[in-house]
Regions:
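Predominantly extracellular beta-rich ligand-binding scaffolds that present long acidic/polar faces
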Residues: 1-48, 60-63, 75, 83, ...
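Active-site and glycan-interaction determinants of carbohydrate-active enzymes
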Residues: 21-26, 45-92, 96-98, 198, ...
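Right-handed parallel beta-helix/beta-spiral solenoid domain characteristic of secreted/periplasmic
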Residues: 33-37, 160-206
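Right-handed parallel beta-helix/beta-solenoid
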Residues: 35-40, 94-129, 146
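N-terminal extracellular ligand-recognition/capping segment immediately after the signal peptide
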Residues: 136-162, 169, 173, 306
Length: 312
């Protein structure tokens, strides 16, 4: 666009390719720069398109008049559809009120970060790239393998709800942080609908939470193994501050920290259910450190660790 300074240029609830760096680009005003994912050459949206339900009912023109969205699309179908939902972007209205949540596949051995990731055959290579192309409430499924390197650690959930899983199990699906950071960071109020399951995390290292660092978020972990992670500060495997997270069917083994060899809690309400904690050590002699908050340990085995410090 080449508008003079006096021209009126209003953009709301629209996709503009390569516009994210423009001085007018503002996601809070409905400015988007993502692939609309057309179903075919007719430019109808696919059911996975994030353009579904992203429209608005009106826009204000230069004279502060409301311009109303049309009641039908190019084919004469009612807009929005269904009624009382938000309209879609573009010329065609989809039958869905919101886009179908997608599954993105990751394969460290055979994946390609230029691939779309929506099938096993078109899997991406890194978890970081799966984060980039996926959206809120999508699922990321990891193939068996060992995931290492900068694109497979320090993964910040960014406030989005995601399910991260594998069908192969933790014995064969491993994130190796190579002592260069934690695997996952939660610091943007992620809810308890964030689920991570079926992975082993090894060689994580950070000041707070060698493998997992949680601050004010409530993720859920199931069927996980945390092994050989360390922290110079708190929580060799997991650091949780003001968190209502839960851990079920998890193993913590050979993790080390200054405080809380396996786990450090500071505020919140965290549960460990059907977990096994073995040979976790800390410089202050606590395998689990509860500095404050409520920690519930149920149906679990705590063996060969330094003693628990704080209330449980």
């Amino acid at each position: 666009f080449d508008n003079a300074a006096t021209d009126y240029f209003a953009v709301e609830n629209s996709i503009f390719e390569n516009s994210a760096s423009a001085n007018w680009f503002d996601p809070d005003d409905g400015h988007y720069d993502f692939n609309p994912q057309f179903a075919d050459t007719t430019y109808v949206l696919s059911e996975y398109s994030r353009a579904i339900g992203r429209g608005g009912s009106s826009i204000e023109d230069a004279d502060e008049n409301d311009l109303l969205a049309p009641g039908v699309d190019l084919l004469g179908n009612p807009r929005p559809n269904p009624a009382e939902s938000s309209p879609d972007l573009g010329a065609y209205e989809h039958v869905r009120s919101e886009y179908r949540r997608a599954v993105y596949y990751v394969d460290d051995a055979n994946g390609d970060d230029e691939a779309p990731g929506l099938t096993i055959a078109t899997a991406v290579k890194s978890i970081a790239n799966a984060f980039i192309i996926s959206s809120n409430r999508d699922t990321i499924e990891l193939a068996a393998g060992t995931y290492s390197g900068a694109d497979n650690r320090n993964l910040n959930m960014g406030g989005l709800t995601r399910i991260i899983r594998t069908s192969s199990g933790p014995a064969s699906t491993i994130i190796d942080c190579e002592n260069q950071g934690p695997a996952f960071v939660f610091d943007t109020d992620e809810p308890d609908s964030v689920h991570i399951s079926g992975l082993t995390i090894i060689n994580g290292s950070s000041e707070n939470g060698g493998a997992i660092s949680i601050d004010g978020a409530d993720p859920v972990f199931e069927n996980m193994i945390f092994r050989d992670n360390n922290s110079d500060g708190n929580g060799g495997a997991v650091y949780a501050s003001d968190s209502y997270s839960s851990f079920t069917n998890c193993v913590f083994v050979d993790n080390h920290a200054d405080q809380g060899g396996a786990f450090y809690l500071s505020g919140g309400d965290v549960s460990l259910n059907h977990c096994t904690l073995l040979d976790n050590t800390a410089d202050d002699d606590s395998g689990i450190k509860n500095a404050s908050g409520d920690l519930a340990v149920m149906n679990s085995i705590y063996w060969g660790n330094d003693e628990i410090s704080g209330d449980v």
